[in-house]
């Protein structure tokens, strides 16, 4: 799935939206997404708390494998 950041308009590929991250000693629902690092331009994976991700990104394209 391709998502767009609400403020920057940058596009990212959603890798996994059903994972966990330990933040401040507490396990929270999280997502992993991939995009270009704004400093280096290299592709990086990012992790964000799911609720924060849902507030800052919108789906722009749902890419299905082998379609």
Which role fits each region the language model picked out?
Residues 7-9, 41:
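Glycine-centered tight beta-turn/hairpin loop motif at sheet-sheet or coil-to-beta transitions
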Residues 18-50:
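Basic/aromatic-rich interaction segments and small domains that mediate binding to polyanionic partners
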Residues 1-6:
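Short coil-to-beta transition motif at edge beta-strands of beta-rich domains
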Residues 10, 29, 53:
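Residues that flank catalytic or metal-binding motifs in active/ligand-binding sites
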Residues 42-67:
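Intrinsically disordered, low-complexity, charged/polar segments
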Residues 10-19:
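Short beta-strand-centered aromatic/proline hotspots
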